[in-house]
Amino acid sequence: MSIFKYEAKELFQWLIDKEEIVVLDVRNDKDFKRFQVESPYPFEMLNVSYYDFMEMEEECVAKLPRNKNIRIVCAKEGSAKYVAEILEKHEFKNVGYLAGGIKSWGNLLIPRLIEQQDSFALYQFIRPGKASCSYGLISGNEIMFFDPSRAVDFYLGFAKQRNCTVVRTFETHLQADYIAGSRDIARQTGAVFHANEGDFSGSKNPYTKLVDGEQFTFSNGGPTVQVVFTPGHTPGSTCYIIAGTYIISGDTIFINSVGRPDLGGKAEEWAHLLFETIGKVKKLDNQLQVLPGHYMDWAEANSDLLFMLPLHEVLERNKHIYGIADEAAFIQFIKDNMRPQPEEYATIRLVNANLEQFDDEKQEELDLGKNECAATAYAAAQATA
């Protein structure tokens, strides 16, 4: 078999099908450690730099198993193809290289059906390269999106395939870790862009201000979408309760941990808000199914590869956080678990507020890489180890 080009969605399918492949990442060590291919199941991955292949071809080739299919990943497609040609020269039989480079993995969205009823269908769109989740709610021939990424063509294509008109798009907060797609979706479709003025008041986005407790529905009735203000991760953080059963929680409630309140440089002030919100969350219906905006790793997914957990289980899993009754102790806990935020987060916030504009290449550069939005990534990992 000659070398061939494959798509990011094919790589994901091979990984969840547990195919016998080796993922060969030929980026430099720094980029590899910052962001790499992840899967729900264990798989073999090697990091051997493209530059090493150029300078030490024989030694690099010797590191690869000849009895397995090789799938090459690099920052750019051309570099991966170059390494694939080296392996073909050395008589490797099944070698593929990723179309579009690592950015295509970073932008990949996987639609997973959460629930299908006569009156509605709810989808989770998993972005493995960012460890993030967005959502789509369909009723009749209308669809609403929640926290869409900048891969706007995916969402519009998803709607078109189902003969749906996009009527609303919601943000849970002003995102810092990825470039949001609501503004462009609204511009291209005429859908209403909803956001909390606590985050968006200084932006140049043409958004419609949310009101705490208000409800939305579809033209044919369908499920309700209830707005719940949950400040803390940001002052305008908002959750959405769907059909009284699900809560799209953004970066407020995670399956492991809660949203970090320090990304705006006001850790103590926002930690106070988060402490109050945690009290509010504990009073919600504990049977609500939590649908988070991010996950730490695939271990949080259920057997259907969905990131979803009943609120009572989330509270129990994170009792080391939700169980802190004293506000001063909670704020100290947050401070003890703070860590530097990626430098690009400040710029991404400006882009999402429409205060700065960049071309597609720069936006992709900013958008690439796994999120760091949990308040206590280290503490949560220790608590669940």
Q: What does each model-identified segment do?
A:
Residues 98, 194-197, 250, 293:
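Generic beta-sheet signal
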Residues 2-5, 9, 21, 30, ...:
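Accessory terminal helices/loops
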Residues 34-38, 84-86, 157, 181-184, ...:
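Short amphipathic alpha-helical segments
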Residues 80, 170-173, 230, 249:
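Ser/Thr-glycine-rich phosphate-binding loops at phosphate-binding pockets of nucleotides
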